[in-house]
Amino acid sequence: MKKILFLIVLGSVLSCKQKITDADISNLNGYWEIEKVELPDGDKKEYKVNETIDFFKIDGNKGFRKKVMPQLDGTYVTNDIQEDIVIAVKDGDATIQYKTTYASWKEEIIELTKDKLVVKNEQDLEYHYKRPVKFSVK
């Protein structure tokens, strides 16, 4: 009985992670804003308003990420700083490998749909992103 319970618990834990395919990677393109961050100790930090959001542009398995600032008229302000990225997909696991002049790091993609992105970095911080809703003042 204990073995069956263990297998059920283990199966449910392992099934929480989405198997990422090359076809899923195109969902990464576009604008993403942080919704929350889950810390290794289980605490969560919620983000109600974001001053900057991330813009991803992927072609094949290479591309870049830029930080952009949404404006009240629905446009975005950006600068020339970008992080070059390479996407590595193997056996259903996918990582985003970032590189700048000053550093390189990677994040594991936990979930990726057209409206949701969850990544985990090397410090076990889990970032939950959603598509931003454009706002404007008229």
Where are these regions (language model features)?
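Positively charged n-region of N-terminal signal peptides that target proteins for export
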Residues: 1-4, 18
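C-terminal motif of bacterial Sec signal peptides marking the signal peptidase cleavage site
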Residues: 12-15
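N-terminal helix-cap/turn-to-beta initiation motif at the start of protein domains
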Residues: 18-33
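Short hydrophobic/aromatic-rich beta-strand segments that constitute the beta-sheet cores
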Residues: 34, 63-67, 94-98, 117-121
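N-terminal glycine/threonine-rich, aromatic-flanked beta-hairpin/loop signature
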Residues: 45-89
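An anionic, turn-rich surface loop/hairpin at beta-sheet edges
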Residues: 76-110
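Short, exposed beta-strand-loop hairpins at the edges of beta-sheets
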Residues: 106-109, 115-128
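Short, low-complexity, Pro/Ser/Thr/Gly-rich segments in the mature regions of secreted, periplasmic
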Residues: 127-138
